[in-house]
Amino acid sequence: MSGLFITFEGGEGAGKSTQIALLASHLRNHGFDPVITREPGGSPGAEAIRHVILSGNAETYGPAMEALLFAAARADHVDQLIRPTLAEGRIVLCDRFIDSSRAYQGVTGNLDATYMAAIERIAIDGAMPDLTLVLDICAERGLSRAGKRRGSDTADRFEKEDIAVHEARRQAFLEIARQEPARCKVIDADRSQEKIADEIRSVVDTILTEKGLL
């Protein structure tokens, strides 16, 4: 894979989709043609599974089987979109990827790390992100933002969970970043959109320069 694979991680209301859009605009201004995608979803098969997961219907299967659903969606996403796009030398910007599974199913789902690592390995088949931007914000602030963004729409099953669960996921993302500093960059998301975007652009531009692409 010769392109650049960038993932955005963080809790509810961290501003991932906003920052992905701003980074995509920045990249287009520099002549790149980035592909924006998301998880769960990103391919027809994965989008079908997304509906099952976010509706809450998958909860009846239990955490272990739900993790397999996420893995199945991810495998299809990687095969149908991510890997072919990277093979074209393009940039992929993905809203959530493996670290969300580690935090959501692995940590707060209390699943064994060996089990999670095994299904992750099968699902991505070597398609690791080149850069993961962890947008960090305290759970209370993030949920408040998510509620304002949602308006009168119904909260999905994850937003409805207890604030302690959201904070545990936040800490899980931060721990992943501590363990994998070469891949992960923590971004303070409790700032203005412009300041966050400036830092993200700086990080990405540095990588593009190092690769001789900018």
Curated annotation (Swiss-Prot):
Keyword Nucleotide-binding: yes
GO biological process: dTDP biosynthetic process; dTTP biosynthetic process; dUDP biosynthetic process
The protein's Enzyme Commission number: 2.7.4.9
Family as reported in the entry's similarity comment: Belongs to the thymidylate kinase family.
PROSITE patterns, alphabetized: THYMIDYLATE_KINASE
Protein keywords: ATP-binding, Kinase, Nucleotide biosynthesis, Nucleotide-binding, Transferase
Domain of life (superkingdom): Bacteria
One Pfam short name: Thymidylate_kin
Amino acids binding ATP: G10, G11, E12, G13, A14, G15, K16, S17
Catalyzed reactions: dTMP + ATP = dTDP + ADP
SUPFAM superfamilies assigned: P-loop containing nucleoside triphosphate hydrolases
UniProt GO MF annotations: ATP binding; dTMP kinase activity
This protein's record includes keyword Nucleotide-binding: yes
Protein name: Thymidylate kinase
Gene Ontology CC: one annotated term: cytosol
CDD domains: TMPK
InterPro entries: P-loop_NTPase, Thymidylate_kin-like_dom, Thymidylate_kin_CS, Thymidylate_kinase
UniProt function note: Phosphorylation of dTMP to form dTDP in both de novo and salvage pathways of dTTP synthesis.
